[in-house]
Swiss-Prot record:
PANTHER family: UPF0102 PROTEIN YRAN. This is UPF0102 protein Mpop_0474. It holds the Pfam family UPF0102. One of its GO terms (molecular function) is nucleic acid binding.
Amino acid sequence: MRPPPDPQARRRATHGRGLSAEALALLALMLKGYRPLARRFAASGGEIDLIVRRGRTIAFVEVKARATLEAAAIAIDGRKRARMSRAARAWLARHRLPADAILRADAVFVAPRRWPLHLPNAFEI
């Protein structure tokens, strides 16, 4: 019989997988011409995994890693979107942007042995 899993070890492993997924997502976005502005920005009770820019577009990116791309897409619920929106507003309050900046909330879904799927305008900020 196996001993019960250590909750802290499981949390560390999950955190490590999340960091790896974010790094892979950032690589995929950079190959598309995006430039990173921030990683793991936290404020106002929310967090944004990546904030990237390409031209006039600023994208607030949620990265989800799951066993399948479909499971990753389902993992972004209304509560997560609301928390991300609060954090995005906090980031915007701290940074001056050009008047013609285009703001988006994107998602990147990561699954094993698959290239990350970038979904622009995944939800409203």
